[in-house]
Regions:
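Membrane-interface transmembrane helices that cradle and orient dolichyl/undecaprenyl
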Residues: 124-129, 162-184, 294-305, 346
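Transmembrane-helix motifs of polytopic, lipid-linked glycan transferases
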Residues: 106-126, 163, 295
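Perimembrane helix-loop-helix junctions
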Residues: 7, 171-174, 202-228
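Membrane-interface alpha helices of multi-pass inner-membrane proteins
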Residues: 135, 162, 179-197, 202-209, ...
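Short periplasmic/luminal acceptor-recognition loop of GT-C membrane glycosyltransferases, typified by
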Residues: 76, 380-383, 391-449, 453-477, ...
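Short acidic/glycine- and proline-prone juxtamembrane loop motifs at membrane-interface regions
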Residues: 146-156
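Transmembrane-helix signature of polytopic, membrane-embedded enzymes
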Residues: 116-140, 159, 305-311
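Hydrophobic, aromatic-rich transmembrane alpha-helices
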Residues: 277-310, 314-317
């Protein structure tokens, strides 16, 4: 029944609003659980992750101790992510490094859950079905989960992008929007640039979309907002070390090569979310998945609300195909545009089916397909457990602890202790090989980079204890370097993980440490 003004009763409106947010909360909860459980089953909250996540957290901790990236240590990305992690690193000074890192990881999982809810919100004007499928698709989409499970660059960059889309949405239907909202949207795009330089690709696509819908003044305001925020965050670091910052963020990234998935097919496979499949399959499956995504793009294009996501999916996807390096989390760059496009396409497909019974059948079939895809998470794990007994050796180390993976310093709660003791700090040991190769103008692998081999040995040997987990068996350290490391007393071993006591040839072992293991 309507009131005299033609509006539904207040209690009906309240119930609708409650149901409205219930869907968002449910989608976010599913997304959070999907991100948390594989980590708990795998390495656990204190485990070893992707290497990169430890690099960014270690960099944030160094900033909390007064060090500056580019000037005091190498960082191959803009400073946005370490700055975002600095509050967790500061809080860790009152607890422990591992606790701060765990809190940061959980925060990223929560951001992933928020991202899923934002996708639902963005697609809501298209229809409830599109919003539901879009949000749930992101919740279980392998590239999204992989990137949101820890402190990787793609997670906060996705959040910034989705809020940008939401803020600019009124422009689609010639609606009015305040200048400050447009400026904030631009600033958020600028934030993506300060997190990863790939944000420039996102900015260009957003500007092209605004020009296509003839929002010229909005495009200018977005450009100004993005430039302003990027300048505020990056210029202080650039002023201190301009050459080093340029070389590390731009030159080294353009010059570097490496990672798996070097073929177009491998990359398309990851972008389409087929990484969830734990067994081999014919290339025809990948081709079919890509064709399905292009079909979704064609369907979604009929909605003006979905055109920016479609452009982002195609533009960012094309960029991923040509970038010189590739790692699994790179597919997270397109995760949100892909699921937004899929959600809008499903909404359009169901709308094309006129008969209500047929719509129900199509919805059930698509829901079943999504459920089958999500079932792939039943046995997936992320990360590796770190041997707790290694802390016996690091806790009693009289000097510094060195490592080939900064995550081990976090796991043993020696990162902040090292920094307080004035130990030599290296957030990204492997990244130095890219910097050295680019500076020399040589395309040389890490194993054959003699300058890096000397650099790594010099650093690892500067500690009283060294934890080696990343480059065993010739994967990063060549035979000569490995032979030197093997001469150091072995304190503990767990699988390929080792704790060694660096000593020079002919020098005695450092007293006060637990007795080395017999080999």
């Amino acid at each position: 029944m309507l009131d005299p003004m033609g509006n539904p009763p207040a209690h009906t409106q309240d119930r609708t609003l409650s149901l409205h947010w219930l869907w968002a909360i449910a989608i976010a909860a599913i997304a959070f659980v999907i991100r948390l459980v594989p980590v708990l089953r795998g390495g656990g909250p204190f485990g070893i992750g992707n290497y990169d996540d430890g690099v960014y957290y270690a960099a944030g901790t160094a900033i909390a101790h007064g060090l500056l990236p580019y000037q005091d240590f190498l960082l191959l990305h803009p400073p946005g992510m370490p700055l975002l992690l600095t509050p967790f690193a500061l809080a860790a000074q009152f607890t422990s490094d591992s606790s701060g890192f765990t809190a940061a990881r959980v925060a990223c999982m929560l951001l992933g859950a928020i991202n899923a809810a934002l996708i639902w919100k963005i697609l809501k004007p298209i229809g409830a079905t599109a919003a539901l499928f879009g949000g749930l698709s992101y919740a279980v989409f392998y590239p999204a989960v992989y990137s949101d499970k820890s402190t990787l660059l793609e997670c906060p960059a996705t959040t910034a992008l989705l809020i940008t889309i939401l803020l600019l949405q009124p422009l689609i239907n010639s609606g009015s929007i305040s200048r400050w909202k447009i400026f904030v949207a631009g600033a958020l795009v600028g934030l993506t640039i300060t997190i990863k330089i790939w944000g420039f690709v996102t900015l260009m696509i957003v500007l092209v979309w605004l020009l296509l819908i003839r929002r010229f003044s909005a495009a200018l305001q977005v450009l100004i907002g993005s430039a302003a925020l990027a300048a505020v965050i990056c210029l202080p670091f650039f002023a201190v070390a301009p050459t080093a910052m340029w070389n590390q963020i731009v030159r080294d990234q353009l010059f570097r090569r490496g990672g798996g998935g070097r073929t177009f097919l491998d990359r398309l496979d990851a972008i389409a979310g087929l990484g969830i499949v734990g067994r081999s399959y014919p290339a025809a499956i990948t081709v079919a998945a890509v064709v399905a995504l292009l079909f979704c793009a064609a369907l979604a294009w009929s909605y003006r609300e979905a055109r920016l996501p479609v452009l982002l999916m195609l533009g960012q996807g094309a960029f991923l195909l040509i970038t010189p390096t590739w790692f699994p989390h790179f597919a997270g760059f397109t995760a949100a545009p892909v699921t937004l496009t899929v959600g809008a396409a499903i909404g359009r497909l169901i709308a094309l089916v006129r008969a209500r019974p047929a719509q129900i059948v199509v919805s059930l079939v698509l829901a079943g397909a999504l459920l089958v895809y999500a079932s792939g998470w039943s046995d997936i794990t992320f990360g590796r457990r770190f041997p707790s007994r290694f802390q016996t050796f690091t806790a009693t180390a009289p000097g510094c602890v060195t490592t080939d993976d900064a995550t081990t310093l976090v796991a043993t709660d020696t990162l902040s202790r090292n920094l307080s003791r004035g130990c030599r700090f290296i957030a990204d040991l492997g990244g130095n090989s890219h910097d050295m190769a680019a500076a020399a103008g040589l395309e040389v692998s890490r194993n054959h980079n003699q300058q890096f081999q000397r650099f790594a040995l010099d650093y690892l040997g500067s500690g009283s204890v060294s934890i080696l987990i990343r480059y065993p068996g010739g994967r990063g350290f060549n035979a000569k370097t490995t032979a030197v490391l093997d001469q150091w007393p072995l304190l503990a071993r767990s699988g390929s993980y080792q704790v060694r006591q660096p000593v020079g040839l002919g020098q005695p072992a450092i007293p006060g440490l637990p007795k080395p293991q017999r080999r």
